[in-house]
């Protein structure tokens, strides 16, 4: 049976998708806020560095912003 990797990769995958889309953290935060997801710069930074758990609503919003499937954030967890 494969071991499941720590949730560390979720934050890394969020950061990877942000880089691939050419966004800064501030741009992502602004888009999240426009979508009704109130998030500060420090909170967003904590999500990317795995110092805070992400909410499902935030994950769904990020998938819309990055035009990707939610599964992208779970790559390399297995």
Q: What are the functions of these language-model segments?
A:
Residues 1-20:
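A short, Lys/Arg-rich alpha-helix, primarily the initiator
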Residues 14, 25, 41, 56-59:
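Helix-turn-helix DNA-binding elements, focusing on the entry/boundary residues of the two helices
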Residues 17, 31, 47, 76:
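Residues in the recognition helix of alpha-helical DNA-binding motifs
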Residues 22-46:
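Short alpha-helical DNA-recognition segment
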Residues 51, 55-72:
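DNA major-groove recognition helix of helix-turn-helix/homeodomain DNA-binding modules
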Residues 72-78:
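Short amphipathic recognition helices of helix-turn-helix/homeodomain-type DNA-binding modules
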């Amino acid at each position: 049976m494969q071991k499941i990797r720590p949730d560390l990769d979720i934050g890394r995958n969020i950061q990877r998708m942000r880089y691939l889309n050419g966004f800064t953290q501030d741009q992502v935060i602004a888009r999240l806020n426009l979508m009704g997801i109130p998030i500060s710069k420090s909170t967003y930074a904590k999500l990317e560095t795995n110092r805070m758990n992400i909410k499902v609503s935030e994950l769904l919003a990020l998938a819309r912003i990055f035009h990707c499937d939610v599964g992208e954030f779970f790559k390399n967890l297995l």
